[in-house]
Amino acid sequence: MKAMILAAGRGSRMGDLTNVTPKPLTRISNTTLIEKNIKNIRKSGIKEIIINVSWLGDRIINHLGDGNKYDVNIYFSDEGKDMLGTGGGILNALDLLDKDPFWLVNADLFCDFSIDIKKTLTNGDLAHLVLVDNPEHHPDGDFLLKNGRVSVCKKKM
């Protein structure tokens, strides 16, 4: 199994902070957002990681290298200046992902997780989602759960 980290975005909501540093390289304590994700992915047993890049992508590529220092193999899907969005970024990286299920993570996710993803896809599941509680300012959220499974996905207005 492989993982893909979405790291091509501009990070515009962070204002001037991302003018010279891409959001995935934002430091929290002694690590960057993207390194935290790489370590969590590795801890879950996955060693092949594809990372899409665009905005300041060369800095991400230079910082992470081939993944050897994280005991993983990193392959980059460079979107150039186009920023293809989530779906376009995945589509652009399909040659690197093969046809097997893969783990998809946003580069700006910062949490501790360790999932045996190989055991979570059962009974014809198309995906396994890790969701977080809704913040107080958005109590309804985008998903509804029934018996621990996503049953409704609200459309964005």
Residue ranges and their predicted role:
Residues 15-16, 37, 61-63, 87, ...:
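Short glycine-/acidic-enriched loop or helix-start segments at secondary-structure transitions
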Residues 24, 73-75, 126:
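Conserved beta-strand segments of alpha/beta enzyme cores
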